[in-house]
UniProtKB/Swiss-Prot annotation:
Listed name of the protein: Tryptophan-specific transport protein
This protein's encoding gene: mtr
Pfam family, one: Trp_Tyr_perm
Sample GO molecular function, one term: symporter activity
Domain of life of the source: Bacteria
Organism, scientific name: Escherichia coli (strain K12)
Keywords on record: Amino-acid transport, Cell inner membrane, Cell membrane, Membrane, Symport, Transmembrane, Transmembrane helix, Transport
Compartments reported by the entry: Cell inner membrane
Cytoplasmic-side positions: 1-15, 63-88, 150-151, 215-228, 307-325, 368-386
Function field: Involved in the transport of tryptophan into the cell.
PANTHER family: LOW AFFINITY TRYPTOPHAN PERMEASE-RELATED
Annotated membrane topology: Multi-pass membrane protein
Transmembrane residue ranges: 16-36, 42-62, 89-109, 129-149, 152-172, 194-214, 229-249, 286-306, 326-346, 347-367, 387-407
Listed PROSITE patterns: AROMATIC_AA_PERMEASE_1 (PS00594)
């Protein structure tokens, strides 16, 4: 397995776009209609667009700092050098927590949707066993190489996009304006539930662990990597918009309360959509799409965790070194998935809390420190100090929202 560095033939732009897009657009999107049902469609779209803007720029700030270090340097190296040991420990804990808990969430989600898929074929496969088997398959692909993940993600994302448009093209045809505009509730309030959506929005635009992986893939080519981040995140925003239209235009707002009470996992939402549409072919497409959605996100997130742990522990890129990294990457979340198979919605929410440190606060601090030391000779994010301040406020604000929510100090749609 060769280390990926800049070569005479540069990898295609599409490979990087699908790594970013595939990481973002995955199982996390299934939580959005459930947690956004209180704020409903238009307020939720405002939250998504604002979050997309902030998360894109925080990723660009990571790139700005990363370009001043050797290819293969991950957050551990960069944060320790620019911000010191204290911030490095805090950042390291938040990275490990986010990536581990997202890996656990996708094991939970894969077990749930595979159990539902096998049930459609009259096969009884327990969710725990299905999630465990799927995790082993993903572990093998990640162990092979970054290029293997890129190629597999490209295949899965391609299949996911095809099934997405087949499924949601049909779903959009069933959208009821009265349902989307929530005509049935004449005195409904939406704005009070807006803050609750922000940590989930943040978790649904998580790709930051893959920025160092892209530098490994393309070398120090900021122009190409910036395009990967912009196109990948825009792809996610577009598909989230279609997803919210398709779900909130078909499932009445009050029905989401029952979906949330059942844990909000993928199979519950798929069953709710199937019940509304009463279409066997659409039901099958939904199930197929759900499987591809989990697979692409699972691959991207675990690649980020894999590269971070390899850098942290100094494991080399040999078969044995990658095996050690793979064991550290997958063993803890697999155990969690076997013990607690239904924690998807809770895991996504807590990932949003920890991700505020790693995906918003620390990137802004890295950009500021990098400019002071290096002057950002290769690439600089536009906006100057005000942009850094905005990303910091965004991160701290998200953390406060989640803490207030944990103590039941924010209104909940129920």
């Amino acid at each position: 397995m060769a280390t990926l560095t800049t070569t005479q033939t540069s990898p295609s732009l599409l490979g990087g776009v699908v790594i970013i897009g595939g990481t973002i657009i995955g199982a996390g999107m299934f939580s959005l209609p459930v947690v956004m049902s209180g704020a409903w469609f238009f307020w939720s779209m405002a939250a998504l667009i604002f979050t997309w803007f902030c998360m894109l720029h925080s990723g660009l700030m990571i790139l700005e700092a990363n370009l001043n270090y050797r290819i293969g340097s991950s957050f551990d190296t960069i944060t320790k050098d620019l911000l010191g040991k204290g911030w490095n420990v805090v950042n390291g804990i938040s990275i490990a927590f986010v990536l581990y808990i997202l890996t656990y969430a996708y094991i939970s989600a894969s077990g749930s949707i595979l159990h539902h898929t096998f049930a459609e074929m009259s096969l009884n496969v327990p969710a725990r066993a299905a999630g465990f088997g799927f995790a082993l398959l993903v572990a093998f692909v990640v162990w092979l190489s970054t290029k293997a993940v890129s190629r597999m993600t490209a295949i899965v994302l391609g299949a996911k996009v095809i099934t997405f448009f087949l499924t949601f093209g049909s779903l959009l045809g069933h959208v009821q304006p009265a349902t989307l505009f929530n005509v049935a509730e004449s005195n409904a309030s939406y704005a009070p539930y807006l803050l609750m959506t922000l940590p989930f929005c943040l978790a649904s635009f998580g790709y930051h662990g893959n920025v160092p992986s892209l530098m490994k893939y393309y070398g120090k080519d900021p122009k190409t990597i910036v395009k990967c981040l912009v196109y990948g995140t825009l792809m996610a925003l577009a598909l989230y918009t279609i997803w919210l239209l398709a779900t909130m235009g078909n499932i009445p707002r009050p029905e989401f309360i029952g979906i949330a009470e059942k844990g909000g996992n993928i199979d519950v939402l798929v069953q709710a959509l199937s019940g509304v549409l009463n279409s066997r072919s659409l039901d099958l497409l939904l199930v197929v799409f759900s499987n591809f959605a989990v697979a692409s996100s699972f691959l991207g997130v675990t690649l980020g965790l894999f590269d971070y742990l390899a850098d942290l522990f100094g494991f080399d890129d040999s078969a044995v070194g990658r095996l050690k990294t793979a064991l550290l990457t997958f063993a803890p979340p697999v155990v969690g998935g076997l013990l607690f198979p239904n924690g998807f919605l809770y895991a996504i929410g807590y990932a949003g809390l920890a991700a505020t440190i790693w995906a918003a606060i620390v990137p802004a601090l890295l950009a500021r420190a990098s400019r002071k030391r290096f002057g950002s000779p290769k690439f600089r994010v536009w906006g100057g100090k005000p942009m850094i301040a905005l990303i910091l406020v965004f991160g701290v604000g998200n953390a406060l929202v989640h803490i207030l929510s944990s103590f039941n100090l924010l209104p909940v749609y129920q």
